[in-house]
Regions:
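Outer-membrane pore/translocation modules
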Residues: 1-37, 90, 95-98, 151
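Outer membrane beta-barrel transmembrane domains
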Residues: 40-45, 49-152
């Protein structure tokens, strides 16, 4: 099935713009990303738009909290891979893509886990707000993101 492929093996272009500003003790951010296949193979994942808006509040140097709203719109798969012809819904290119709106809350805390002075550990809980997926796709549930950052 297409969802189990590591890539569509196409040359892709991702362009975006990010704006971050400060208002009082808050950081406000917006980001727009567009992803498309330039050199298409027999099949490619559909064009994708991502829009993120967030607010972040720092509490001292070591702790921050954030809230984020994310919108994603992805077209269905273009083309067909003749080696993916199993009689299952995941082999149908029309069962991919759609629109999703997520809401996330997160926190970031300074750390010296590996002895550095500029390390952070971040975590974010992502909850689906609205899902309009194409074809026969399972609804998404919550997800948890854990990240580590080091600034050199």
């Amino acid at each position: 099935p297409y969802g189990m492929q590591s890539s569509d093996r196409s040359r892709r272009l991702t362009v975006g713009i990010t704006n971050v500003s400060t208002l009082g003790g808050y950081r406000l951010g917006n980001q727009l990303l567009f992803d498309t296949a330039l050199a298409k193979k027999s099949w490619t994942y559909g064009d994708q738009w991502n829009v993120n808006s967030w607010v972040q509040r720092d509490f001292g140097h070591d702790l921050s909290f954030s809230a984020r709203l994310h919108y994603k719109s992805q077209q269905s798969i273009n083309g067909r891979d003749v080696s993916i012809m199993a009689p299952v819904q995941t082999a149908n290119p029309d069962n991919y893509g759609g629109q999703v709106v997520d809401f996330a809350v997160g926190m970031s805390v300074a750390s010296n886990m590996f002895g550095g002075n500029h390390e952070k550990i971040g975590m974010e809980l992502v909850l689906p707000v609205k899902q309009n997926k194409r074809g026969l796709q399972m609804e998404s549930n919550w997800s948890f993101i854990l990240g580590y950052e080091i600034t050199l």
